[in-house]
Regions:
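Conserved PLP-binding catalytic core of the aspartate aminotransferase-like
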Residues: 1-12, 16-51, 61, 65-69, ...
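PLP-dependent enzyme catalytic core of the Aspartate aminotransferase-like
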Residues: 49-53, 60-100
Length: 100
């Protein structure tokens, strides 16, 4: 449980440092807010090509204009897994104009 908590905090901190809007949570499910359905689908597809499996959620699963990428963290993730995911989010976020 301690490792899961550490992994969640580490991932969220890294993502926020890059400029991503992360919905506050106490769980291991992290919502990276993108607000646009097509963007969330494209972002998730590009992450999969980078070896990162995530789900893009959009209306009607979440309210309109609250599309997001759902990241499920676990205690089995090692720091290098988290770093790879953060780096992939950074690369694609810049390509798609989500972050600078």
């Amino acid at each position: 449980q301690d490792k899961l908590h550490w992994n969640s905090e580490y991932f969220v901190a890294g993502m926020r440092t890059l400029g991503f809007d992360i919905k506050p949570t106490k769980s291991a499910i992290c919502a990276v807010m993108l607000y646009d359905a097509r963007l969330s689908q494209e972002f998730a597809a590009r992450l999969l090509k980078e070896g990162i499996y995530v789900i893009g959620f959009y209306f009607p699963v979440v309210p309109k204009n609250e599309a997001r990428i759902r990241v499920q963290l676990s205690a089995s993730h090692e720091r290098e897994h988290l770093d790879k995911a953060i780096q992939a989010f950074e690369k694609i976020g810049k390509e798609l104009g989500v972050i600078k």
